[in-house]
């Protein structure tokens, strides 16, 4: 008999939204990880992915699954996900050693009806893109607020995150506004705890560019990517296989690329 907690009898958390996030993440792990045949797992960042790592840690402690999960190697997308991996007793490794990942889990800032994503609100978009595109299967977990009724840019109003080389940020801002007609293109600042721009793990800046509702994210991605000085764009195109949305009422919606 499995000692992994049954999702139907989980104790309540601090609020319904956290319950929803946990349920979405647990179901994503339960329904997608092939414990006997998969070994390299990508772990992203964000408040919902916390529960992905937690669920994998629960399987690690179950005698029925220990022999499999103890052989997993987990690839992080940043400092937060690195901590999640270690805190749950999972084995940490790097994409340098495992350039092909069996399955990756991450969150999203917004998801449209075609499973196109905006990501990068946490300023880890380059590493997130590297891990997700290196994965044979990419599964997204999020709460219902991240689900757009149609187009990207409907719910997520902070703009498309764009990682840029610091010496080119003025040029990129100019081109976003004047060539691609962004409504705004703002260098993300560090907030009250840090003077100056946010600096990514790769020592670059982030520009948040607002294009309003994005009806053709594929062409916008290509246009931004071609600008000199752009390192990576927070539009994840044709990448996600499934998205699990946790709802406030405790239910989970699943968008599947196959459907």
From Swiss-Prot:
Q: What is its EC number?
A: 5.3.1.6
Question: Which EC class is the enzyme in?
Answer: isomerase
Which is one Pfam family of this protein? Rib_5-P_isom_A
Among the GO molecular function terms of this UniProt record, one is: ribose-5-phosphate isomerase activity
Positions the record marks as coiled coil are none
The domain of life is: Eukaryota
Compartments annotated for it: namely: Cytoplasm
One Gene Ontology cellular component annotation held by this UniProt entry? cytoplasm
Q: Which UniProt keywords apply?
A: Cytoplasm, Isomerase
Record-linked InterPro entries? NagB/RpiA_transferase-like, Ribose5P_isomerase_type_A
Q: Which reaction does it catalyse?
A: aldehydo-D-ribose 5-phosphate = D-ribulose 5-phosphate
Q: Which GO terms describe its biological process?
A: D-ribose metabolic process; pentose-phosphate shunt, non-oxidative branch
Pathway per the UniProt entry: Carbohydrate degradation; pentose phosphate pathway; D-ribose 5-phosphate from D-ribulose 5-phosphate (non-oxidative stage): step 1/1
Indicate the family of this protein. Belongs to the ribose 5-phosphate isomerase family.
User: What's this protein's name?
Assistant: Ribose-5-phosphate isomerase
């Amino acid at each position: 008999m499995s000692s992994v907690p049954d999702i139907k009898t989980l104790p309540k958390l601090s609020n319904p939204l956290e319950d929803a996030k946990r349920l979405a993440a647990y179901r994503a792990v339960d329904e997608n990880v092939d414990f006997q045949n998969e070994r390299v797992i990508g772990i992203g960042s964000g408040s919902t992915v916390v529960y992905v790592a937690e669920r994998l840690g629960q399987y690690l402690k179950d005698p029925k699954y220990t022999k499999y999960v103890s052989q997993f190697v987990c690839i992080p997308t940043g400092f937060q996900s690195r901590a999640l991996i270690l805190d749950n007793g999972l084995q940490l490794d790097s994409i340098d050693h495992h350039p092909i990942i069996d399955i990756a889990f991450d969150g999203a800032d917004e998801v449209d009806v075609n499973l196109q994503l905006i990501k990068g609100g946490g300023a880890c978009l380059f590493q997130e893109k590297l891990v997700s595109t290196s994965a044979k299967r990419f599964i997204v977990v999020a709460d219902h607020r991240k689900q757009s009724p149609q187009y990207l840019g409907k719910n997520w109003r902070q703009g498309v995150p764009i990682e840029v080389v610091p010496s080119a940020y003025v040029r990129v801002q100019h081109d976003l506004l004047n060539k691609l007609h962004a409504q705004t293109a703002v260098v993300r600042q560090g907030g009250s705890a840090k003077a100056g721009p946010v600096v990514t793990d790769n020592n670059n800046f982030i520009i948040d560019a607002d294009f309003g509702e994005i009806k053709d994210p594929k062409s916008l991605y290509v246009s931004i990517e071609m600008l000199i000085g752009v390192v990576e764009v927070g539009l994840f195109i044709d990448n996600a296989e499934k998205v699990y949305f946790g709802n406030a009422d405790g239910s989970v919606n699943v968008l599947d690329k196959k459907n």
